[in-house]
């Protein structure tokens, strides 16, 4: 039998870990996933009810329900022909030469399902957060990340073989000739991309990916395509700069995107179109289309038709469904209570920053200014993004609706370039069990769905709530001061606001945090301290600040606080899924998240009488304190 002094995670969650079962259609079960399952059940019933009693007074929700009904009309889906998919494939098949491809770039972006072998995006400018910038990156890889392509990776061959076989079967369904050769050619192009692709560690340090290049310099370096004309077609003007997020890809552009590789690029585009179409037709094709993803994570069976129907609707109407969910399930009492906790947590942070022992007063004061400028959003947004008023279902097929929606969404992406950034917009729907900090707007967002037990409940004690949602709130605040967020000022701009000596001291703290987790063994392999450092800084800051706030309450119970902390990180997952997370997820494995941060807190040792001989013991000189 385990003891808290040896393993907080395993002891607190012992009964749950023994009894919890991973759903057959998921790679894991966790405190988060349990709420997701509850929400799915509620929303499926809600949308089915709305299907019978159409919300004619809510035009956006009405369109979502129409699409939901179409997604669930399996009689029509089973009979639907593939002419629209074949039409999309033909848009690429008829590009016989690289010259044809060059002459059709704009058409492919705005009026086809074919992805280009490079990507332009419109994001808030990291150095001018009120305006948008044009970003440039590579096209993404077939395997989860670059580490999977190492020859010593145990799953490399089986995953690539499975993808090729699965993709050729999909292509054959759409009557594509030479399906096996096309799948093999796509893999050849994918392999060419690997050396120039960012690693997961590089993506994790997103503040370091901001590489602005004047548009003239950017387009002149690329000889094989007329990117100047494409950019003008995309954003209807000539920006003064392009932000390159994947340097190696940009440097390698002409050696990858050229006449010699055209047949490989063409094959790669065809596979993307075909795979992307599998969700919109008959049941056999839907099952076939999801097979690779299930094999990757060792998921036992496909999502049910009902869940798929909800998933597909959410993929286009997420904020619409979120707003409906928030208004139905999130009460004013809970909103007021969570707002009170956010205010309390910010006050705790103010006090901790003012007493910080390793920052100069000047930097601490600027940190407090940034803290005071953080805007919290709780529950659900006040309004929907305007784009939803444009999404209208038609009399055509489910796939044809999706094509139209994708065109509208793509056009909207580039249309935003000439507008100011709306810092009140939400990037997560209210029914998503999650929370986030946005560095470019300096906002923290807590959707309604996470504001449920075990994270939060009006029925739980204050210590339980601080051990749950309190740590999540403080975690998101801490992201303003993690290795990425700390580089953004109170306005959301990438801007050096620290004194040099303070930032150097912070970098030393980061190294200590990396060392604390790096190489720690889990059942799926060792943790990568560099990949997960930002989230670990936020976890440590979160539990530290929430603990301080919990102690200020009259009914403080630190055993309940630490137990609740361990409960929110409970998780069981397939080994394959855990291995994938180790390679690419910026969060630490669940058990390490639960067990390591408390060992840096004196109160943990006092509460559970942890001794030097216990496994959870960390010597005082090795206990890390950042915020």
Curated annotation (Swiss-Prot):
- Residues engaged in binding Zn(2+): 475, 479, 535
Biological processes per GO annotation? protein processing
Sorted alphabetically, the keyword list is: Hydrolase, Metal-binding, Metalloprotease, Protease, Zinc
Q: What is a GO molecular function of this protein?
A: metalloendopeptidase activity
The record's active-site residues are 476, 539
The UniProt record lists the Peptidase M13 domain at 1-627
CDD domains cross-referenced by the UniProt entry = M13 (cd08662)
Q: What does this protein do?
A: Endopeptidase with broad substrate specificity for several oligopeptides.
Q: Of which family is this protein a member?
A: Belongs to the peptidase M13 family.
Q: What is this protein called?
A: Neutral endopeptidase
Q: Which gene encodes it?
A: pepO
């Amino acid at each position: 039998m385990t003891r808290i002094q040896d393993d907080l995670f395993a002891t607190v969650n012992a009964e749950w870990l023994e009894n919890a079962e991973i759903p057959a259609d998921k790679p894991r079960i966790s405190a988060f996933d349990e709420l997701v399952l509850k929400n799915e059940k509620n929303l499926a019933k809600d949308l089915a009810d709305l299907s019978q009693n159409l919300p004619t007074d809510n035009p956006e929700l009405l369109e979502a329900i129409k699409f939901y009904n179409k997604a669930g009309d399996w009689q029509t889906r089973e009979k639907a022909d593939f002419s629209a998919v074949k039409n999309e494939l033909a848009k690429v098949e008829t590009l016989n030469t690289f010259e044809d491809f060059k002459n059709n770039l704009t058409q492919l972006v705005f009026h086809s399902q074919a992805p280009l072998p490079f990507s332009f995006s419109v994001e808030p400018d990291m150095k001018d957060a009120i305006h948008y910038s044009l970003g440039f990156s590579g096209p993404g890889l077939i395997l989860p990340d670059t580490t999977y392509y190492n020859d010593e990776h145990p799953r490399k061959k089986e995953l690539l073989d499975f993808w090729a076989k699965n993709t050729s079967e999909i292509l054959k369904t759409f009557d594509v000739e030479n399906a096996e050769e096309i799948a093999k050619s796509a893999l050849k192009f994918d392999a060419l991309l690997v050396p120039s692709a960012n690693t997961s560690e590089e993506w994790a340090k997103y503040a370091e990916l901001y590489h602005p290049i004047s548009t003239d310099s950017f387009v002149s370096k690329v000889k094989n395509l007329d990117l100047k004309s494409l950019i003008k077609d995309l954003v209807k003007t000539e920006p003064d700069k392009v932000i390159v997020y994947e340097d190696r890809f940009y440097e390698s552009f002409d050696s990858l995107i050229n006449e010699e590789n055209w047949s490989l690029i063409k094959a790669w585009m065809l596979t993307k179109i075909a795979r992307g179409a599998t969700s919109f037709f008959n049941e056999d094709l839907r099952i076939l289309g999801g097979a690779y993803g299930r094999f990757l994570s060792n998921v036992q069976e496909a999502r049910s038709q009902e869940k798929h129907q909800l998933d597909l609707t959410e993929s286009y109407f997420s904020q619409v469904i979120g707003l409906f969910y928030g208004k139905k399930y999130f009460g004013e009492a809970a909103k007021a209570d969570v707002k009170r906790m956010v205010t309390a947590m910010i006050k705790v942070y103010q006090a901790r920053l003012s007493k910080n022992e390793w920052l100069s007063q000047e930097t601490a004061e600027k940190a407090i200014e940034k803290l005071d400028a953080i805007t919290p959003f709780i529950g659900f947004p006040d309004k929907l993004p305007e784009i939803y008023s444009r999404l209208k279902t038609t009399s055509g097929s489910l796939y044809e609706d999706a094509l139209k929606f994708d065109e509208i969404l793509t056009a909207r992406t580039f249309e935003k370039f000439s507008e100011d950034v709306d810092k009140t917009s939400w990037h997560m729907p209210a029914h998503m069990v999650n929370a986030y900090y946005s560095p470019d707007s300096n906002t923290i967002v807590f959707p309604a769905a996470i504001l449920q037990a075990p994270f939060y409940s009006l029925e739980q004690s204050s210590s339980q709530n601080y051990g749950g949602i309190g740590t999540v709130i403080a975690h998101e605040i801490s992201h303003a001061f993690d290795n990425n967020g700390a580089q953004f000022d109170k306005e959301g701009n990438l801007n050096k606001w620290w004194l040099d000596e303070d930032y150097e001291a912070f970098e030393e703290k980061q190294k200590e945090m990396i060392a604390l987790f790096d190489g720690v063994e889990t059942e799926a392999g060792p943790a990568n301290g560099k990949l997960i450092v930002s989230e670990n800084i936020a976890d440590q800051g979160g539990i530290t600040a929430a603990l301080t706030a919990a102690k200020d309450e009259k009914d403080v119970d630190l055993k309940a606080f630490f137990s609740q902390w361990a409960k929110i990180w409970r998780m069981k997952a397939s080994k394959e899924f855990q291995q994938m997370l180790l390679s690419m997820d910026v969060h630490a494995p669940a058990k390490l998240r639960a067990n390591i941060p408390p060992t840096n807190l004196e109160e943990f040792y006092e509460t559970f009488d942890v001794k030097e001989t216990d496994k959870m013991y960390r010597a005082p000189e090795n206990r890390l304190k950042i915020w």
